[in-house]
Each structure stands twice: as structure tokens, then as C-alpha cells.
């Protein structure tokens, strides 16, 4: 996937952090939940534990002389996932608010803080 050119004004912000619990909204894995293993803000993608898993054939090498197959998670586009509300367990949008001088993420549906 080509990256935006150096001069583009692409928004490199994500609503997700490593460790967040998210749910997949669309596609083959719709409805599955998992923790964010890796956030890729430049590509607007996230890697979710146990979702979008592929089997990769690995050639034998010095570190792995046997070779074989390994399971690996691929990145999903950030628009296909949503944060899980800690109170209801359902997908929610996120709003940022300042609480006690700190900027925190708040679930829109329930008003609970996520951070």
C-alpha cells in the first residue's frame, strides 16, 4: 500500500492505543473482539490479537533451521474497528475531555473514561 507523499496533509492520529479492547465492525471478522497489539497511525491501521490471522510459510534459516508454518495477525484499517465500551461491552465512539488537568478518552455512549 503506498504511503502518502511527504507533502500531504494526512492525519496521522488514531483513536486506538496498544492494549485497547476493540471490536471489528465490518468484513470477514465482523463481531470479533481483541486487544490492539500494534497501532500504525501513519497507515491508519491496527493489528488486533486473534483477528485477521493468516498462516505464513517460513523458510528454514539459521535461527529456525526447521522452517515450517507460523500464524500471524495482519493489520486492519482503523475505520473497520471501534473501541469497546468498558461498561456495556459494545462498540462506542470516543470523545476527548480534560479531567483534573489531564486529557482522557471518554466513551460517548456511557460517559465512562477509557484511559
Swiss-Prot record:
Biological process terms in GO annotation: translation
Gene3D superfamilies membership: 2.30.30.30
Annotated S-S bridges: none
Single GO MF annotation: rRNA binding
Annotated keywords: Ribonucleoprotein, Ribosomal protein, RNA-binding, rRNA-binding
Pfam families tied to this protein: KOW (PF00467), ribosomal_L24 (PF17136)
GO cellular component, one term: cytosolic large ribosomal subunit
InterPro entries in the cross-refs: KOW, Rib_uL2_dom2, Ribosomal_uL24, Ribosomal_uL24_CS, Ribosomal_uL24_KOW, Translation_prot_SH3-like_sf
Top-level division of the source organism's lineage: Bacteria
PANTHER family, A to Z: MITOCHONDRIAL RIBOSOMAL PROTEIN L24
Protein task: One of two assembly initiator proteins, it binds directly to the 5'-end of the 23S rRNA, where it nucleates assembly of the 50S subunit.
Family from the record: Belongs to the universal ribosomal protein uL24 family.
Protein name: Large ribosomal subunit protein uL24
Amino acid at each position: 500500500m503506498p504511503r502518502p507523499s511527504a507533502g500531504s496533509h494526512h492525519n496521522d492520529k488514531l483513536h486506538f492505543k496498544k492494549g485497547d479492547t476493540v471490536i471489528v465492525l465490518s468484513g470477514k471478522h465482523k463481531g470479533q473482539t481483541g486487544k490492539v497489539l500494534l497501532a500504525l497511525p501513519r497507515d491508519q491501521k491496527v493489528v488486533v490479537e486473534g483477528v485477521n490471522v493468516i498462516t505464513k510459510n517460513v523458510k528454514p534459516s539459521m535461527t529456525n533451521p526447521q522452517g515450517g508454518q507460523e500464524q500471524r495477525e495482519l493489520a486492519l484499517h482503523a475505520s473497520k474497528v471501534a473501541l469497546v465500551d468498558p461498561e456495556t461491552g459494545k462498540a462506542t465512539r470516543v470523545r476527548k475531555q480534560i479531567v483534573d488537568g489531564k486529557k482522557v478518552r471518554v466513551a460517548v455512549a456511557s460517559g465512562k473514561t477509557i484511559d
